[in-house]
Structure formats: structure tokens, C-alpha cells
Amino acid sequence: MGRPPCCDKIGIKKGPWTPEEDIILVSYIQEHGPGNWRSVPTNTGLLRCSKSCRLRWTNYLRPGIKRGNFTPHEEGMIIHLQALLGNKWASIASYLPQRTDNDIKNYWNTHLKKKLNKSDSDERSRSENIALQTSSTRNTINHRSTYASSTENISRLLEGWMRASPKSSTSTTFLEHKMQNRTNNFIDHHSDQFPYEQLQGSWEEGHSKGINGDDDQGIKNSENNNGDDVHHEDGDHEDDDDHNATPPLTFIEKWLLEETSTTGGQMEEMSHLMELSNML
């Protein structure tokens, strides 16, 4: 089971040290030096165990012990040594001769441990914020690249359309030239069938007939006006019929009507070709 602690022996005093006990211990250490702690209680007559005497001297009575706040340099050393050695406070205190292991342990538990936890939390939050900013930046870059690629695609389509547009204009010019040729051929064909002298003679003949018809109509109207009252109404009725009757069509008018109907069909064909050219 091992050796029982010396503090559990009968007659060993526990609890706070008195000023008289401190004076006896300091006087003995100054005379004999620190060491051989097992003989200290017997040689001094103190009712304390050897471990209690050593800790009292090391943590409170030895000269050069520094009290008060820890400097930033001391804090850094404690943090570094605690990460390497763990909670071995006596070993850590050996690197800080002016600080006791008890003071180092208390300062670690009350200040440094909480400070490190807060620093780790802040560092974690900062890392998360950086990660979020990085992801948002990547998303922005991806969006810009997508927009650039779409813009490039549109530019390529426009470039292809500009290349294809001269072909469509060429086809439109070809259709217009073709329609112009058809119109010229149509005019030449009918001018061959109806010479200018024949058309002029037909027009003069129709015009003279129209004038003679008007003279005959005037004579008839005067005769009807000079008749008796019985025939007056009949004469008026005949005048109205003659006035509303459609005069006979001359040769030139018939030809113009035929040309108009034929030209209407040609114009429909031309409009259809123009629509096809616009679609191309």
C-alpha cells in the first residue's frame, strides 16, 4: 500500500503557520541551509512534517519571492511551459525562480486559463468570418465568370449574325432585281401587243364618241322639254335613265381594266417575294 503521508502521524500539527513557527524555521535554514528536510522537524522542535516545512520555506519564507501581478513575459512563459509540461507547477516554477509554484498554479486557474479560452473563442469566430468572406468572394468570382461567359456567347452570336447579314442582303437584292426584270418584261410584252399609234387612235375614237353622245343627249332633252304635259313625266324618266346609264367602254378602257387585273396578280406575287426576303 505504500508509506502513509507524514502529516497523518500522531502529534503532527496541521493548519496555518504561526509567526513563531516561521521565525524558528527561518533561523534554522539560515544556519544550516535548505535541504535534508526530514531532519528539520526533529532539529527545530517544530510539530510539523518535513513536507510542510519545505513548502512553507519555498512558497513563503525564502528570500527573493516576487509578489504581485505577473508581467507579460512571465505570462508567456507560463503558457508555453504549461503547454509543454502540463500541470507540473513545481517544474514550471523552477524556470521562474522569483515565483512560487503555488502562485503560478493560482494565477493559471484564475486568470490565464480564462484568458486563453476567450482568445480561442475569438480566434474561432475570426476564422469563421474569414471562411465566410472567402466563400462569398469565390461566389462573386464565379458569378462574374458566368456573366463574362454569357457575354462572350452573345458577342459570338452577334458576330455570326453580322457575318450572315450580308448574305441576306444579297438575297434581297437578287429578288428585287428579279422582280424588276419581270416588270420590264411585262411592259415590253404589252407594248409589243398594243403599239402606241393603235392605242392613241382608240382613245381618240372613244373620246369623239363620248362628245357626240353628249350632243345627241342634249337634243333629246330639248325636244322633251318642248312637248306637252302628258309626255313631260315620260321625258323626265327617259332623261334619268339616259343620264344614269353607263356609257359603253372604249377599247383603251377595256385594255386598262385588263392590265389592272393582271398587274394586281403581279403585285401580290411581288409582295409575297418581299416577305420571303424579309424572313431570310
Curated annotation (Swiss-Prot):
Mediates the inhibition of anthocyanin (e.g. cyanidin and delphinidin) biosynthesis when expressed in lettuce L.sativa and could thus be used for the development of new varieties of lettuce. Promoter triggering guard cells-specific expression can be used in tobacco (N.tabacum) and tomato (S.lycopersicum) to monitor stomata genetic engineering. Specifically expressed in guard cells. Present in seedlings, leaves, stems and flowers. One of its GO terms (molecular function) is DNA-binding transcription factor activity. The modification S-nitrosocysteine is found at C49, C53. PROSITE patterns: HTH_MYB. Residues 37-61, 89-112 bind DNA. Residues 128-149 have a biased composition (Polar residues). Transcription factor involved in the regulation of gene (e.g. drought-regulated and flavonoid biosynthetic genes) expression and stomatal movements leading to negative regulation of responses to drought and responses to other physiological stimuli (e.g. light). Promotes guard cell deflation in response to water deficit. Triggers root growth upon osmotic stress (e.g. mannitol containing medium). Induction: Induced by jasmonic acid (JA) and salicylic acid (SA). Triggered by auxin (IAA) in roots. Stimulated by light, UV-light and cold. According to PubMed:16005291 and PubMed:23828545, rapidly repressed by abscisic acid (ABA) in an ABI1-dependent manner. But in contrast, according to PubMed:21637967, transiently induced by ABA in seedlings. Rapidly repressed by drought. Activated by white light, but repressed by blue light and darkness. Transiently induced by salt (NaCl) in seedlings. Induced by sucrose. Positively regulated by SCAP1. One of its GO terms (cellular component) is nucleus. The keyword Repeat applies. Residues 118-149, 204-247 are annotated as: Disordered. This is Transcription factor MYB60. One of its GO terms (biological process) is response to sucrose. PANTHER family: MYB FAMILY TRANSCRIPTION FACTOR, TRANSCRIPTION FACTOR MYB60.
